[in-house]
């Protein structure tokens, strides 16, 4: 994963993604008739925007990537809770680009780039971020993630790679995913389900399994298969190497993947990445990292000032007051009307300049 250094470009076949227990629009993209994603159409830049676009084409992306990594680490230290299970949600979202970005690669559905994220639901912040061409396989990026002992990694079927799954198990970590439809599994023994009912789903089968194909040596770890029936009547299959958690707890972990989908939706709708100042590869990467830096800064500011309002409302208030001198801890309070005495124009904790 890229948090420091110059982001690299990877090319391979695109991965696939599966449905969730709690279905939402894939990657938060607004659907068009026929299920196609709406492309970002960069418009020709105005004369006033051209100097900034030219600068974005030359600025080193590595500086922004390193800044995001430092902020993500700071936010993790603020929110870390001893004794809590470490959960890591892994997913990617496409960033469709228009015709002006002729350099963008296509994965068969869209032409553009792809943002890969490792998300910590406890701190509500991405821990790792990578930006690649749209045709890069999700499993290719997954194999570059540093595995944390004791953590549980939750991802969809696009991250199917037996070697990576084995590495997770050997690092004494866990994964919860969905197997591909062509993955042959043989039941070793049935497991007793103590509690079957969950929040909006029911676990109807729990079994220890192994690969049924001749290549079972490629995945020499014990596996557990769960069959889960959702409230809408559909059933899905989950696969994990966690043999201790209750079946209903594992199903609930996978259902929690909707949190990273909401993150993608929030970023695209509220951090202004639907249009870019610059149409080359460097400018687009730079603005994507800048959007994630803004997200991390908002989360840090909210926690330092004990702001408990929804992040969406906090973001809207910050945007409205961006060019005003306001106490961020009281940003939700309206400014005084006709104050009886003149108040200083700047915060007492903010440096200001004046003629003497």
Swiss-Prot record:
GO biological process: DNA transposition
Entry keyword set: DNA recombination, DNA-binding, Plasmid, Transposable element, Transposition
Gene Ontology molecular function, alphabetical: DNA binding; transposase activity
Region listing for Disordered, in residue ranges: 1-54, 334-356
Low complexity bias (residue ranges): 1-19
InterPro entries reported for this sequence: RNaseH-like_sf (IPR012337), Transpos_IS4 (IPR047952), Transposase_11 (IPR002559)
Name of the protein in its database record: Putative transposase y4zB
Species assigned in the record: Sinorhizobium fredii (strain NBRC 101917 / NGR234)
Classification lineage: Bacteria, Pseudomonadati, Pseudomonadota, Alphaproteobacteria, Hyphomicrobiales
């Amino acid at each position: 994963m890229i948090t420091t250094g110059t982001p690299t470009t990877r090319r391979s076949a695109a991965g696939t993604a599966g449905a969730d227990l709690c279905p939402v629009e894939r990657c938060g993209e607004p659907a068009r008739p026929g299920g196609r994603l709406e492309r970002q159409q960069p418009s020709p830049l105005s004369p006033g925007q051209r100097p900034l676009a030219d600068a974005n084409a030359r600025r080193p992306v590595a500086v922004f990537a390193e800044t995001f990594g430092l902020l993500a680490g700071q936010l993790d230290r603020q929110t870390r809770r001893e004794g809590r299970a470490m959960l890591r949600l892994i997913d990617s979202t496409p960033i469709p680009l228009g015709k002006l970005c002729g350099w963008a690669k296509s994965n068969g559905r869209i032409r553009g780039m792809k943002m890969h994220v490792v998300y910590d639901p406890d701190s509500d912040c991405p821990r790792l971020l990578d930006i690649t061409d749209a045709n890069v396989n999700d499993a290719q990026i997954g194999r570059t993630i540093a595995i944390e002992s004791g953590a549980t990694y939750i991802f969809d079927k696009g991250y199917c790679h037996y070697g990576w799954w084995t590495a997770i198990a050997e690092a004494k970590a866990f994964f919860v995913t969905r197997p591909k439809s062509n993955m042959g599994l043989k039941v070793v023994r049935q497991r007793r389900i103590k509690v079957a009912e969950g929040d909006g789903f029911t676990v109807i089968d729990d079994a220890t399994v192994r690969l049924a194909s001749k290549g079972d040596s490629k995945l020499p770890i014990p596996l557990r298969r769960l069959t889960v029936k959702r409230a809408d009547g559909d059933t899905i299959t989950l696969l994990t190497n966690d043999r201790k958690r209750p079946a209903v707890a594992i199903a609930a972990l996978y259902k929690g993947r909707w949190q990273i989908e909401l993150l993608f939706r929030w970023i695209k709708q509220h951090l202004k990445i639907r249009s870019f100042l610059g149409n080359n590869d460097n400018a687009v990467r730079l603005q994507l990292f800048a959007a994630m830096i803004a997200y991390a800064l908002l989360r840090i500011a909210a926690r330092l000032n004990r702001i408990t309002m929804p992040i969406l409302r906090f973001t809207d208030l910050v945007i409205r007051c961006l060019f005003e001198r306001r106490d961020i801890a009281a940003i939700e309070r309206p400014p005084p009307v006709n104050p009886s005495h003149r108040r200083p124009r700047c915060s007492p904790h903010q440096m200001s300049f004046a003629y003497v």
